[in-house]
A protein has these predicted regions:
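Intracellular loop-helix junctions on the cytosolic face of multi-pass helical membrane proteins
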Residues: 1-25, 117-130, 153-291, 305-307, ...
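Helix-loop boundary and gating motifs at the non-cytosolic
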Residues: 13-73, 274-281, 285-299, 303, ...
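Transmembrane alpha-helices of Major Facilitator/SLC transporters
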Residues: 72-79, 312-335, 345, 349-352
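Helix-to-loop junctions at the C-terminal end of transmembrane segments
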Residues: 76-95, 188, 324-341, 426-427
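Transmembrane alpha-helix termini and helix-breaking/packing motifs in multi-pass membrane transporters
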Residues: 84-87, 117-119, 177-197, 330-331, ...
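C-terminal ends and interior cores of transmembrane alpha-helices
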Residues: 100-123, 347-364
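C-terminal transmembrane helical hairpin of 12-TM major facilitator-type secondary transporters
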Residues: 340-390
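A late C-terminal transmembrane helix in Major Facilitator Superfamily
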Residues: 394-428
Length: 472
């Protein structure tokens, strides 16, 4: 099994090296930059998008439904194999397989953000929905390329490095979503043109991201194509024994290795029962956080906080604490093992949502608002780093984009598609935010039960990196 062999071959010197020294690795700078790029689209179609629609007078249910365009993130596994196999004319030849696809996707996000600045939800929501869907499609494609870039840059043969990469990419993601998002909120509340000016600002940030990707990031080295060619040759040989015509056998072999082999390899390596359990855990783990996160900004506004207060607390302070907690979470998860990290952070993530229930009962209180954001950021950082490391270690180096995209898509399913009903739920609860956040608290329970049930099989698969017998 490729992942097991990689872990078994992990360099010994890393174990004796202080974890913080791993962050001096230049590769982590590249990963942070791409993490920032991955998080940026959520500055456009996340909280800013929800509050923009709320300011335009749309109902909570409508905001939740419009936000469901983000379900495209849960579908990117459908075209992820193309990023492993298809070479874009000129782009991939000039910049490499990973960077070529990333640049194309980033150009799409930039164009979509400019278009968003020209739309008006008070005139009609159809154009808004189409532009948002275009942005999300570009962002979802970018995510596939970025995740593959990260795993190929620091592979499973460097388990501590991969854990550090998970922390850095998560810190970059929150920086990309938080800092530009805070700037957008501030501009929307103070600058002439309001949200249109804010979206123009976000388009400028995206343009800078494209320039950095273009000029400074190297293409990762990988023997992916050689392994894929071997798999394709085996399929052609099997087809030749059945006397399949040469041209047809070439097409069938290419399709098999592109669309079927990544998933067949994953099931063969883990077994069908464990595969289904892993995907079930991934879907369920962050569903409570997804429901809460979709409506958080709307909740802040309804409670009476201004755009500037949201930008200061949820944006700037939230970004600083989240980035710090992400790096700390990397250290904690390496010392405790991914299993304990997922289990403890899952419980803490649920309890943090109770703070929002209290906040709903107390009313607009800046101190409580700040405490809620810090508590939520700590648990989110802890769980996100463990979660990213978990699915990274499960990913084959041969089919990086395809396999990671499937698992990430399952996680995005709860964050996007299932959470589309969050606004409807608040409406059905007669606007009771306290009850809504209480319900999100208990949503994580099924995933933790499932994780406990499959822990032994995962330990056999991943070893000490997943479940340390003694936390260090």
């Amino acid at each position: 099994m490729q992942t097991d062999r990689a872990l078994a071959a992990a360099p010994e010197e890393a174990e004796g090296q202080p974890f913080w020294k791993l962050f001096a690795d230049r590769r982590l700078i590249y990963i942070f930059i791409l993490g920032f790029a991955s998080g940026f689209p959520w500055a456009v179609i996340g909280n800013a998008f929800s509050v923009w629609l709320s300011d335009a007078g749309l109902t909570r249910t409508s905001i939740g439904v419009l936000g469901s365009v983000t379900m495209i993130f849960a579908l990117n596994f459908l075209w992820a194999p193309l990023l492993d196999r298809v070479k874009l004319p000129w782009l991939c030849r000039r910049f490499g397989q990973r960077r070529g696809w990333i640049l194309l996707a980033q150009a799409g996000v930039f164009i979509g953000t400019l278009a968003m600045a020209a739309t008006d939800p008070t005139v009609g929501v159809t154009a808004v929905a189409l532009v948002a869907a275009f942005i999300v499609f570009g962002a979802a494609t970018q995510d596939v390329g970025i995740d593959a870039y990260r795993i190929e840059t620091i592979p499973a043969s460097e388990p501590r490095g991969m854990a550090a990469a998970a922390a850095v990419t998560a810190a970059g993601w929150w920086s990309g979503a938080g800092l530009p998002g805070a700037g957008a909120f501030w501009i929307a509340g103070t600058a002439p043109g309001g949200w249109s000016t804010a979206f123009h600002f976000l388009a400028l940030v995206m343009a800078l991201i494209v320039i950095v990707t273009l000029l400074f990031l190297p293409e990762p080295e990988s023997d992916r194509e050689a392994h894929q060619a071997e798999d394709e040759a085996r399929v052609r040989e099997a087809l030749s024994k059945r006397r399949t015509p040469g041209r047809l056998s070439t097409v069938v072999a290419w399709f098999t290795v592109t669309a079927i082999a990544p998933f067949a390899e994953f099931v063969r390596r883990n077994g069908l029962k464990l595969t289904v359990s892993i995907l079930g855990f991934i879907v369920l783990f962050k569903i409570g956080e997804a429901f809460m996160g979709r409506m958080a900004a709307v909740f802040y506004r309804e409670l009476g906080f201004t755009h500037q207060e949201i930008a200061l607390v949820s944006g700037l302070m939230g970004w600083f604490t989240m980035t710090l907690f992400m790096l700390l979470a990397g250290i904690i998860n390496v010392r405790m093992g991914i299993f304990r990290g997922l289990l403890i952070s899952g419980v803490a993530m649920a309890l943090a949502n109770l703070v929002y229930s209290v906040m709903a009962l107390v009313g607009p209180n800046m101190a409580l608002f700040a405490f809620a954001v810090v508590a939520d950021n700590f648990t989110t950082a802890f769980s996100t780093v463990a979660f990213v490391a978990f699915i990274s270690f499960l990913t084959s180096q041969v089919y990086t984009a395809s396999q990671y995209a499937v698992m990430a898509s399952m996680g995005n399913l709860s964050r996007t598609s299932l959470a589309a009903g969050s606004g409807w739920m608040v409406d059905m609860l007669a606007g009771s935010w306290a009850m809504f956040f209480f319900i999100t608290t208990i949503m994580v329970t099924p995933s933790l039960v499932l994780l406990w049930w499959i822990r032994k099989q995962l330990y056999e698969q991943l070893g000490e990196v997943f479940y340390k017998r003694k936390a260090t």
